[in-house]
Amino acid sequence: MATGVYKTTKKDGSVYYRVSITYKNKHISIGSYDDEFLASAAYAIANDVLYKPGTYYIDKDMHTTSYNHIAAELSNNASLKSSNISDGTSVDFFTFFPYAKFISLINFRDNGIYIKTPIYLCDKSFLYFLNPENILTFSTDDLFYYSHHTILCRGGYYFVNDYGMQTSILSRFGIRNHSVKGRDYIFRNGDEHDYRYENVCVINKYNGVNKIEKNGRTFFQSRIHINGNYIIGIYK
């Protein structure tokens, strides 16, 4: 049996292989595989990620990683492809190595803290890598929360599953589900992926209240919805 690979049997009697690696005295689970070759390859990649920072890295300033580059390199290198899986198929190394695990391992290597969610720590902020093209920035005040909650994205809507409910990440700023970007809240620097507290500005904090500009002055319009919108009044 290859290093870091452990043969296990399921309740139905079928065999699978668990993969784990130890780094800085911490035992880290990589995943489970139905094929021993894939399990061995996953361990090899995890080992390389931890011990080859020049090849496997995160550029925190550019918000990029070497993931896509390495995946493409492996895909184009026939000697690095699997041709020995039980069913005869050929599998590229990075098609089965989780992107989130890639980020977690690099963060642990660079910052000494292992976080299960795809977070990379920066100075006074952290990056959350949903995928190679979608990276969010948060204030460190949110680190504990997102270390224990996985962010999901559907149609540009970012949310977490919190106690069985889909909760928008905007709710942490007091922004309601029906709020409209540009009217009820804005991103100060124009970056809609920057969720640091200093960048998210809540304009309308209350139900039925809209901030309006008239003749260079700011007013607040109050309205109620009863079979249509009715304006209650405009206030300074």
Tell where the protein language model's regions lie, with residue ranges:
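Basic K/R-rich, polyanion-interacting modules in nucleoproteins and related proteins
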Residues: 1-14, 61-216
